Curated annotation (Swiss-Prot):
Residue ranges of the propeptide: 22-32
SUPFAM superfamilies linked: Defensin-like
Species name: Chlorocebus aethiops
Gene Ontology BP, a term: response to bacterium
Lineage, uppermost ranks: Eukaryota, Metazoa, Chordata, Craniata, Vertebrata
Keyword tags: Antibiotic, Antimicrobial, Defensin, Disulfide bond, Membrane, Secreted, Signal
Protein name (database record): Beta-defensin 1
Homology family: Belongs to the beta-defensin family.
């Protein structure tokens, strides 16, 4: 009986985390912007992009630039 309560409690916690929208699903198929930038050959920089590179997107939830 305790096992069923423990499983129900765990399920409720899991669903409440998913409903809050705190990027819980990032590891379940959605790729972060940092991963996509590096995978496409770019660099994530907080400062301006170096000469001869262009901004291709953002990194770290829009806090940095993806330079390529």
């Amino acid at each position: 009986m305790r096992t069923s309560y423990l499983l129900l409690f765990t399920l409720c916690l899991l669903l409440s985390e998913m409903a809050s929208g705190d990027n819980f699903l990032t590891g379940l198929g959605h790729r972060s912007d940092h991963y996509n930038c590096v995978r496409s050959g770019g660099q994530c920089l907080y400062s301006a992009c170096p000469i001869y590179t262009k901004i291709q997107g953002t990194c770290y939830h829009g806090k940095a630039k993806c330079c390529k």
